A protein has these predicted regions:
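Active-site segments that bind and position negatively charged phosphate/pyrophosphate groups
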Residues: 1-63, 68-69
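C-terminal charged capping/lid subdomain of soluble metabolic enzymes
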Residues: 46-129
């Protein structure tokens, strides 16, 4: 999935940041990386059709497409700080992405990926009804 969907730098950096939040401990490496793939696609401004395709694919595999599916319906300010300290730290792989990486930009990309996931799940439920 990762090689086709986005660079693995952002995906694994997001995973590493998520591991700083104890509430994500029950979730597997691949589940956290899946959400990182979505964040990486948003960071890289992937075409809309590619985003839809990856959301469908991850959902079909029962992988998380929202933060809530990773046990994070909301994050505290401290959780965001811990996550971003790791995901955007000076030695983080995310700096291999082809754009300037900022903590605010990564947070916004994660929030957008989460919002898109919620919208996707809402529209998927409607089409199954």
């Amino acid at each position: 999935v990762g090689f086709e969907a986005t660079n693995l730098a952002a995906a694994h950096s997001i995973h590493n940041g998520l591991t700083r939040i104890p509430r994500t401990a029950p979730y597997l490496h691949g589940e956290k990386v899946a959400f990182g793939i979505l964040t990486g696609l948003v960071l890289n401004r992937a075409p809309e059709e590619e985003l839809r395709r990856v959301y469908r694919f991850l959902n079909a595999l029962q992988l998380p497409v929202t933060l809530e599916q990773l046990g994070l319906p909301e994050l505290t300010g401290q959780e965001w700080e811990d996550l971003l300290d790791t995901a955007c730290g000076p030695h983080s792989l995310i700096h291999n992405e082809p754009m300037e990486i900022t903590r605010q930009g990564v947070r916004e990309a994660m929030e957008e990926a989460d919002a898109r996931g919620k919208a996707f799940l809402g529209s998927s439920a409607e089409t199954r009804s």
